């Protein structure tokens, strides 16, 4: 979804699915053409999220990826990206499918039975709708879990790497103002906040290292 204003120089701010694979942006830090802004869908960020989760839970020899197979293209892209990242990190990757609230519950029971070391929640509307359920299940089964939205960390999720949906409108206003003042859109990165929940980390017996704290945009106590 693109939005533009006549007052803006021929460049536009993009909101919603900004993904490097589409060619819309060359990278999250440096985009090409006439688009910049905030990425809401985190499909193209699976590899980075897996890396950060592995750094937070280095003892995990197996990490699961939760995807919704109903989204065939999106699920497949996330699986391929995660598999490539897992090989590079030398960790085993387990793909877990869930389409509904009941299937999410069953997925966590399976993960606990298999003693999976950590979980990466893929990008899908069902998982956002069931955010509170997923956070609660991760706590119940003591599975370190990474989420795509910072909304998850505000309700007890361990960590997130993705857009703060509640902050999108404010940040778009900031970007628009900077462009109107003459800043080139090519100098504005696509924003992807990283946040940790220290209370959840302590409950899981995890220590957030100084290097991870250094890249965090926020820490929820």
Describe the predicted segments one by one.
Residues 1-221:
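Short hydrophobic alpha-helices and adjacent helix-cap/hinge residues
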